């Protein structure tokens, strides 16, 4: 690595005269030379820890093809020295004067358009040097190919303080051909010419390209896999650069040196503790004595744990046989112990491949994140050392401290906060639990903060739960990206669900994928899973009213039963809750997207302790809610949602479960018209679909009904939907904003208001949290001008995670009178007035303007 790393002193003759950073605590200014050396140190550290050489070798083989040794060494030198050149532009005399308080060659100041900017100047320094080197190559095709990468790498440097813009926008600024008249690149080059002549005594600046069509079209004939490789490498280098720069700056400013980036240490010990847990011991004992059980004996088996154990061991065997593949599918019935199976598979990868030292567990909802954190706690909770390596990354949980309070005793607090923040920004945790949304920001977000943790994905295991919850309009793009990322970055991806589409039908990338449960029928058709719940369609003959539904439910609740009712629209759930609350003699609860994790836990605890209870809910109930009901009622939507819902009924399989389906609201309004799965012909209105729900033949459902339609839509002429156009136009040309827009998992709450309802909430441990105190703490923190930025950032994130339990999203048309507003959050002092006796939000208060005038 060091062999190709250039020394800044040999490239520029003023690196010790110019400064890169000024410290706030009276430390000496940091020279450009010192900062570059530190940045190189971190770049090399990341390179080694993450085995980036393997990524580059794979990229060269797959993307560059056969090139001369000379060109290959130059290509690698160009990549490695992105970090070397990233701050060269700080020699800018205006930067030195304005930002560093240092008078330096003011006669060579750039024009006012550039002002004190440095990133664009760094990028032309980089281009100037490497275009000169490329010129020396003999082969013209190699010269042109390497020039492409010189421009891409210089683009990365130009963006290391900002978000990722469209590559073409940057290129056009270099040639002055930008439609917006953006010509910073042209101005930067003119300044560099002058600078080289006056300061470095050099005359020439190599000629820049002034047309980009050939470069951008160069791979138009290529397969999508190569386009994903180009995107992944660009994002990886950008992520490594901003990480190295941040780590180096933190070391200078705060003295915090980062030695490891959250790799799992003492892997064997963790696996040992896992294998000693009661569940694992019983699985291993079964494996020695009975596994594999013959088909007949298994069909007669009445203990659901035996089936879970068989499935666990089947998946483990398949994985070991195919350990070199990259993408694995784990299709297993609801309630078959997928989470534990996935944990075991992650550890199996680590045992077999010592490069893999990081695990990401990724779920569709925060409730699932929380639930799986609880499972990990059950296994490792006694072991503090293991639990310091596990972190939940979302907005609901405070930032993790990976160090002992005692370690910081008497030490500089600011160093502690710096480390906590860096760990969170760069995902420096060995085991990360988070959501699909977080992962997609890391993979596709155009903001610098999004890409911070991208390099951490190299040599990791990513377990993706419930992938079918993504918009199916994105399935083809998702599997194409995932397969490319997995191959290039050595990621092992496990995709798991009870209703798993065969995504292979949607991609041209034919790299081997592995189905971990080869004999799915053995489990899906087993009475313990298939006959646990019976579906009843008597209410589906026509549209139903809420009154008719209520009457039917009251006919069922009599003899001590727990009943779950799911609506697909929140408004219907709320209306029905109010209606049935007035009539019902047993307890009634409501669970919607409004219910905080705390609220949900309380409701679940109450339900467990009662014999007769009614739970009214929205889709939040479909996954990750640990309840076991006797009877279910569900408004029909997508077949995979119906199956998920059935998983909430008769989970223990100890009695007969029943689910009634009804038709109330229009699913298109909820899931969007681009979801193939809500078309009437593939819903439970059709006899054929009812049969699939009974036989659990989801592969057939997807392969015959859904995937062909998704594929057809992806081939439509409409460029917004066309898969090929997206990869050829946006991915190949590195149109980062377009890629982010396309790969958005959900349309965010654009027109919603955040309202903070201050009240008292009782935590699980019985502690009472006062929302008014938390708001006051938040206000004081914002007003504190003296606190250091890093400490303030950490504390603000932590207080915001506490505030989430009090914040509700309301429509922009909501009527209310706030007591205070900070930023985009409206504060209401007497929040209690907005909840009923069950702690359920009374949304109608915000609709009719009665609000606080009570």
Features from the language model and the residues they span:
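Accessory nucleic-acid engagement/destabilization modules that flank
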Residues: 2-285
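Walker A/P-loop
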Residues: 323-346
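Conserved Walker A/P-loop ATP-binding site and its immediately adjacent core
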Residues: 357-380, 394-397
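Inter-Walker segment of RecA-like/P-loop motor cores
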Residues: 383-444
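C-terminal helicase lobe and adjacent C-terminal extensions/tails of nucleic-acid helicase motors
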Residues: 486, 551-560, 566, 571, ...
């Amino acid at each position: 690595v060091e062999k190709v790393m250039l020394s800044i002193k040999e490239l520029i003759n003023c690196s010790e005269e110019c400064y890169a950073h000024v410290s706030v605590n009276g430390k000496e200014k940091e020279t450009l030379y010192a900062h570059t050396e530190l940045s190189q140190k971190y770049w090399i550290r990341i390179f080694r820890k993450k085995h980036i050489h393997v990524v580059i070798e794979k990229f060269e083989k797959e993307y560059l093809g056969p090139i001369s040794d000379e060109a290959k060494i130059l290509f690698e030198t160009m990549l490695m020295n992105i970090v070397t050149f990233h701050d060269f532009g700080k020699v800018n005399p205006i930067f030195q004067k304005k930002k560093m308080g240092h008078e330096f060659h003011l006669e060579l100041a750039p024009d006012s358009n550039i002002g004190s900017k440095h990133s664009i100047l760094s990028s032309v320094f980089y281009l100037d040097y490497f275009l000169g080197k490329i010129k020396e190559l003999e082969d013209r095709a190699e010269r042109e190919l390497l020039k492409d990468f010189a421009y891409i790498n210089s683009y990365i440097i130009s963006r290391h303080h900002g978000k990722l813009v469209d590559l073409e926008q940057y290129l056009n600024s270099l040639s002055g051909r930008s439609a917006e008249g953006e010509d910073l690149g042209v101005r930067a080059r003119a300044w560099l010419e002058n600078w080289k002549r006056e300061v470095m005594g050099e005359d020439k600046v190599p000629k820049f390209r002034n047309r980009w069509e050939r470069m951008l079209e160069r791979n138009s004939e290529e397969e999508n896999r190569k386009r994903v490789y180009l995107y992944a490498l660009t994002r990886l280098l950008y992520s490594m650069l901003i990480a190295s720069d941040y780590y180096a700056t933190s070391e200078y400013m705060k003295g915090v040196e980062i030695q490891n980036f959250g790799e799992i240490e003492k892997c064997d010990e963790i696996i040992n503790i896992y294998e000693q847990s009661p569940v694992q011991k019983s699985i291993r004992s079964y494996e020695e004595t009975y596994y594999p059980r013959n088909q007949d004996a298994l069909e007669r088996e009445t203990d659901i744990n035996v089936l879970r154990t068989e499935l666990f061991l089947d998946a483990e065997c398949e994985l070991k046989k195919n350990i070199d593949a990259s993408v694995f599918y784990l299709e297993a019935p609801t309630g078959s112990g997928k989470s534990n199976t996935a944990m075991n598979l992650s550890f199996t990868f680590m045992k077999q491949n010592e490069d893999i030292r990081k695990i990401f567990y990724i779920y569709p909802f925060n409730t699932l994140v929380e639930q799986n954190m609880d499972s990990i706690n059950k296994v490792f909770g006694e072991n503090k050392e293991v639990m310091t390596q596990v972190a939940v990354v979302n907005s609901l949980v405070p930032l993790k401290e990976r160090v002992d309070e005692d370690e910081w005793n008497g030490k500089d607090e600011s160093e502690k906060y710096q480390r906590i923040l860096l760990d969170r920004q760069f995902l420096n945790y060995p085991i990360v639990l988070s959501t699909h949304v977080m992962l997609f920001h890391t993979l596709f977000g155009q903001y610098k903060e999004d890409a911070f943790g991208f390099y951490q994905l190299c040599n990791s295991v990513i377990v993706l739960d419930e992938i079918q919850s993504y918009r199916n309009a994105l399935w083809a793009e998702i599997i194409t990206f995932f397969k490319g990322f997995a191959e290039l970055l050595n990621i092992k991806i496990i995709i798991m669900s009870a209703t798993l589409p065969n995504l292979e039908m949607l991609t041209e990338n034919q790299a081997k994928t592995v189905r971990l449960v080869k004999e799915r029928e053995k489990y899906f058709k087993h009475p313990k899973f298939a006959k646990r719940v019976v579906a009843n369609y008597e209410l589906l003959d026509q549209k139903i009213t809420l009154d008719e539904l209520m009457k039917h439910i009251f006919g069922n609740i009599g003899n001590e039963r727990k009943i779950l009712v799911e609506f697909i629209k929140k408004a219907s759930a709320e209306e029905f809750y109010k209606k049935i609350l007035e009539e019902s003699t047993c307890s009634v609860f409501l669970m919607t997207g409004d219910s905080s994790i705390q609220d949900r836990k309380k409701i679940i605890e109450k339900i467990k302790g009662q014999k007769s209870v009614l739970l009214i809910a929205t889709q939040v109930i479909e996954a990750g809610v640990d309840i076991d009901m006797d009877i279910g009622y569900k408004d029909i939507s997508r077949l995979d949602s119906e199956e998920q819902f059935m998983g909430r009924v008769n989970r223990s399989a100890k009695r007969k479960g029943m689910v009634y389906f009804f038709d109330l609201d229009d699913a298109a309004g909820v899931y969007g018209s681009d979801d193939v799965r809500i078309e009437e012909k593939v819903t439970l209105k059709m006899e054929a679909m009812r049969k699939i729900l009974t036989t659990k033949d989801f592969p057939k459902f997807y392969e015959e009904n859904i995937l062909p339609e998704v594929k057809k839509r992806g081939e439509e002429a409409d460029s917004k939907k066309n898969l090929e156009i997206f990869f050829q136009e946006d991915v190949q040309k590195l149109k980062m904003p377009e890629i982010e827009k396309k790969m958005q998992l959900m349309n965010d709450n654009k027109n919603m208001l955040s309202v903070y309802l201050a009240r008292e909430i009782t935590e699980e441990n019985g502690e009472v949290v006062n929302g008014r105190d938390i708001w006051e703490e938040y206000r004081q923190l914002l007003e504190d001008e003296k606190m250091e930025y890093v400490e303030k950032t950490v504390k603000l994130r932590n207080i915001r995670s506490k505030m989430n339990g009090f914040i509700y999203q309301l429509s922009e048309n909501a009527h209310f009178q706030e007591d205070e507003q900070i930023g985009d959050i409206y504060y209401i002092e007497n929040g209690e007035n907005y909840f009923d006796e069950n702690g359920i939000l009374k949304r109608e208060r915000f609709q009719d303007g009665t609000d606080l005038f009570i």
